[in-house]
From Swiss-Prot:
One of its GO terms (biological process) is ribosomal small subunit biogenesis. The lineage of its organism: Bacteria, Bacillati, Bacillota, Clostridia, Peptostreptococcales. One of its GO terms (cellular component) is small ribosomal subunit. The gene is rpsD1. Keywords: Ribonucleoprotein, Ribosomal protein, RNA-binding, rRNA-binding. It comes from Alkaliphilus metalliredigens (strain QYMF). This is Small ribosomal subunit protein uS4A.
Length: 207
Protein backbone atom coordinates (compact mmCIF):
# COMPACT_ATOMS: atom_id res chain seq x y z
CA UNK A 1 0.00 0.00 0.00
CA UNK A 2 1.65 3.22 -1.19
CA UNK A 3 1.78 6.14 1.22
CA UNK A 4 3.25 9.65 1.30
CA UNK A 5 6.42 9.42 3.41
CA UNK A 6 7.92 12.93 3.24
CA UNK A 7 7.50 15.51 6.03
CA UNK A 8 3.74 16.07 6.19
CA UNK A 9 4.09 19.67 7.42
CA UNK A 10 5.37 20.54 3.93
CA UNK A 11 1.95 19.58 2.57
CA UNK A 12 0.18 22.14 4.77
CA UNK A 13 2.63 24.82 3.70
CA UNK A 14 2.16 23.87 0.05
CA UNK A 15 -1.62 24.28 0.33
CA UNK A 16 -1.39 27.41 2.47
CA UNK A 17 -3.67 26.11 5.23
CA UNK A 18 -3.75 23.60 8.05
CA UNK A 19 -4.60 20.07 6.93
CA UNK A 20 -4.44 18.74 10.52
CA UNK A 21 -2.11 15.90 9.59
CA UNK A 22 -0.21 15.73 12.89
CA UNK A 23 -3.01 15.65 15.43
CA UNK A 24 -2.56 17.73 18.59
CA UNK A 25 0.57 19.46 17.26
CA UNK A 26 -1.56 21.23 14.64
CA UNK A 27 -3.41 23.12 17.39
CA UNK A 28 -0.23 24.51 18.97
CA UNK A 29 2.36 27.16 18.12
CA UNK A 30 4.65 24.34 16.96
CA UNK A 31 2.56 23.95 13.80
CA UNK A 32 4.82 24.59 10.79
CA UNK A 33 2.30 26.77 8.99
CA UNK A 34 2.05 29.03 12.05
CA UNK A 35 5.81 29.55 11.94
CA UNK A 36 6.30 29.64 8.18
CA UNK A 37 3.11 30.38 6.28
CA UNK A 38 4.64 30.07 2.83
CA UNK A 39 5.28 27.22 0.41
CA UNK A 40 8.38 25.07 0.92
CA UNK A 41 11.36 25.47 -1.39
CA UNK A 42 13.66 28.21 -2.60
CA UNK A 43 10.88 30.36 -4.06
CA UNK A 44 8.22 29.50 -1.51
CA UNK A 45 7.71 33.06 -0.25
CA UNK A 46 6.39 34.24 -3.63
CA UNK A 47 3.18 32.46 -4.62
CA UNK A 48 2.44 32.80 -8.34
CA UNK A 49 -1.04 33.49 -9.65
CA UNK A 50 -2.45 30.18 -10.84
CA UNK A 51 -4.21 29.43 -14.12
CA UNK A 52 -7.71 27.89 -14.04
CA UNK A 53 -6.09 24.48 -14.43
CA UNK A 54 -3.67 25.27 -11.61
CA UNK A 55 -6.53 26.25 -9.29
CA UNK A 56 -8.39 23.03 -10.09
CA UNK A 57 -5.26 20.94 -9.58
CA UNK A 58 -4.51 22.56 -6.21
CA UNK A 59 -8.07 21.84 -5.06
CA UNK A 60 -7.69 18.18 -5.96
CA UNK A 61 -4.33 18.00 -4.20
CA UNK A 62 -5.82 19.63 -1.13
CA UNK A 63 -8.65 17.07 -0.96
CA UNK A 64 -6.24 14.17 -1.43
CA UNK A 65 -4.03 15.47 1.35
CA UNK A 66 -6.86 16.08 3.79
CA UNK A 67 -7.90 12.43 3.48
CA UNK A 68 -4.44 10.94 2.93
CA UNK A 69 -5.35 9.36 -0.42
CA UNK A 70 -3.03 8.95 -3.40
CA UNK A 71 -3.98 9.62 -7.03
CA UNK A 72 -5.02 6.13 -8.18
CA UNK A 73 -7.37 5.65 -5.22
CA UNK A 74 -8.71 9.19 -5.51
CA UNK A 75 -9.49 8.69 -9.21
CA UNK A 76 -11.25 5.44 -8.36
CA UNK A 77 -13.44 7.29 -5.88
CA UNK A 78 -14.22 9.96 -8.47
CA UNK A 79 -15.30 7.32 -10.98
CA UNK A 80 -17.53 5.74 -8.31
CA UNK A 81 -19.02 9.13 -7.50
CA UNK A 82 -19.64 9.92 -11.17
CA UNK A 83 -21.68 6.74 -11.59
CA UNK A 84 -23.91 7.50 -8.62
CA UNK A 85 -27.08 9.57 -8.85
CA UNK A 86 -26.88 13.17 -7.72
CA UNK A 87 -24.06 15.69 -7.56
CA UNK A 88 -20.72 14.08 -8.45
CA UNK A 89 -18.65 16.38 -6.25
CA UNK A 90 -20.83 15.81 -3.20
CA UNK A 91 -20.82 12.07 -3.88
CA UNK A 92 -17.02 12.15 -3.94
CA UNK A 93 -16.77 13.88 -0.57
CA UNK A 94 -19.33 11.47 0.89
CA UNK A 95 -17.23 8.50 -0.23
CA UNK A 96 -14.08 10.00 1.27
CA UNK A 97 -15.88 10.74 4.55
CA UNK A 98 -17.06 7.15 4.88
CA UNK A 99 -13.59 5.61 4.71
CA UNK A 100 -12.95 3.68 7.91
CA UNK A 101 -9.81 5.65 8.80
CA UNK A 102 -11.69 8.93 8.44
CA UNK A 103 -14.56 7.57 10.54
CA UNK A 104 -12.18 6.58 13.35
CA UNK A 105 -10.79 10.13 13.26
CA UNK A 106 -14.23 11.75 13.14
CA UNK A 107 -15.33 9.68 16.15
CA UNK A 108 -12.45 11.11 18.17
CA UNK A 109 -10.73 7.72 18.49
CA UNK A 110 -7.52 9.04 16.88
CA UNK A 111 -5.86 12.47 16.86
CA UNK A 112 -5.36 12.55 13.08
CA UNK A 113 -6.35 10.61 9.99
CA UNK A 114 -2.77 9.34 9.73
CA UNK A 115 -2.92 7.93 13.25
CA UNK A 116 -6.37 6.48 12.54
CA UNK A 117 -5.01 4.74 9.44
CA UNK A 118 -2.18 3.20 11.44
CA UNK A 119 -4.52 2.01 14.19
CA UNK A 120 -6.86 0.42 11.64
CA UNK A 121 -3.99 -1.36 9.87
CA UNK A 122 -2.83 -2.77 13.22
CA UNK A 123 -6.23 -4.36 13.75
CA UNK A 124 -7.54 -2.24 16.63
CA UNK A 125 -11.07 -1.79 15.26
CA UNK A 126 -14.15 -3.81 14.43
CA UNK A 127 -17.07 -3.05 12.14
CA UNK A 128 -20.34 -4.68 13.19
CA UNK A 129 -18.35 -6.97 15.48
CA UNK A 130 -15.84 -8.22 12.90
CA UNK A 131 -12.23 -7.06 12.68
CA UNK A 132 -11.46 -4.81 9.72
CA UNK A 133 -7.87 -3.71 9.07
CA UNK A 134 -8.38 -1.93 5.74
CA UNK A 135 -8.32 1.89 6.09
CA UNK A 136 -10.18 2.36 2.78
CA UNK A 137 -13.10 0.15 3.88
CA UNK A 138 -16.29 2.12 3.21
CA UNK A 139 -18.85 2.14 6.00
CA UNK A 140 -22.61 2.39 5.51
CA UNK A 141 -25.50 3.88 7.45
CA UNK A 142 -26.19 1.69 10.46
CA UNK A 143 -22.65 0.32 10.74
CA UNK A 144 -21.11 0.18 14.22
CA UNK A 145 -17.39 0.86 14.61
CA UNK A 146 -15.65 -0.01 17.88
CA UNK A 147 -12.25 -0.50 19.44
CA UNK A 148 -11.71 -4.26 19.57
CA UNK A 149 -12.18 -5.93 22.95
CA UNK A 150 -8.51 -6.91 23.03
CA UNK A 151 -7.35 -3.36 22.30
CA UNK A 152 -9.52 -1.62 24.92
CA UNK A 153 -7.03 -2.69 27.60
CA UNK A 154 -4.03 -1.15 25.84
CA UNK A 155 -2.51 2.01 27.43
CA UNK A 156 -3.41 4.03 24.32
CA UNK A 157 -7.14 3.37 24.57
CA UNK A 158 -7.27 3.40 28.37
CA UNK A 159 -5.92 6.93 28.26
CA UNK A 160 -8.32 7.87 25.47
CA UNK A 161 -11.27 6.61 27.50
CA UNK A 162 -10.20 8.61 30.56
CA UNK A 163 -9.57 11.83 28.64
CA UNK A 164 -12.07 11.58 25.79
CA UNK A 165 -12.93 15.06 24.53
CA UNK A 166 -14.15 14.44 21.02
CA UNK A 167 -17.22 16.01 19.46
CA UNK A 168 -18.68 14.16 16.52
CA UNK A 169 -20.54 15.30 13.39
CA UNK A 170 -24.33 15.01 13.43
CA UNK A 171 -24.27 11.95 11.16
CA UNK A 172 -22.38 9.95 13.78
CA UNK A 173 -23.02 8.91 17.38
CA UNK A 174 -20.33 7.90 19.87
CA UNK A 175 -20.22 6.14 23.24
CA UNK A 176 -16.96 7.21 24.87
CA UNK A 177 -17.32 4.67 27.68
CA UNK A 178 -17.54 1.76 25.26
CA UNK A 179 -15.18 3.38 22.72
CA UNK A 180 -17.58 2.76 19.90
CA UNK A 181 -19.58 4.77 17.43
CA UNK A 182 -22.33 4.33 14.89
CA UNK A 183 -23.09 5.75 11.47
CA UNK A 184 -26.52 7.27 12.13
CA UNK A 185 -26.88 8.44 8.52
CA UNK A 186 -24.78 9.09 5.47
CA UNK A 187 -23.20 12.56 5.59
CA UNK A 188 -24.69 15.43 3.61
CA UNK A 189 -22.55 18.20 2.12
CA UNK A 190 -23.45 20.44 5.07
CA UNK A 191 -21.98 17.84 7.44
CA UNK A 192 -18.53 18.04 5.84
CA UNK A 193 -16.66 21.00 7.28
CA UNK A 194 -13.52 20.91 5.13
CA UNK A 195 -12.68 23.93 2.91
CA UNK A 196 -12.90 22.02 -0.36
CA UNK A 197 -14.53 23.29 -3.58
CA UNK A 198 -15.50 19.93 -5.01
CA UNK A 199 -16.88 21.48 -8.19
CA UNK A 200 -13.31 22.41 -9.19
CA UNK A 201 -12.27 18.76 -8.88
CA UNK A 202 -15.19 17.70 -11.07
CA UNK A 203 -14.18 20.30 -13.67
CA UNK A 204 -10.59 19.03 -13.63
CA UNK A 205 -11.52 15.39 -14.20
CA UNK A 206 -14.16 16.28 -16.78
CA UNK A 207 -11.63 17.75 -19.23
Amino acid sequence: MARYTDAVCRLCRREGLKLYLKGERCYTDKCAITKRNFAPGQHGTSRKKLSNYGVQLREKQKAKRFYGVLESQFRKYFDMADKQAGNTGENLLRILETRLDNLVYRLGLASSRAEARQLVVHGHFTVNGGKVDIPSYLVKAGDAVAVSEKSTNSPKFKELKENFKGTVPTWLTVDSEKLEGKVAAMPSREDIDLPISENLIVELYSK
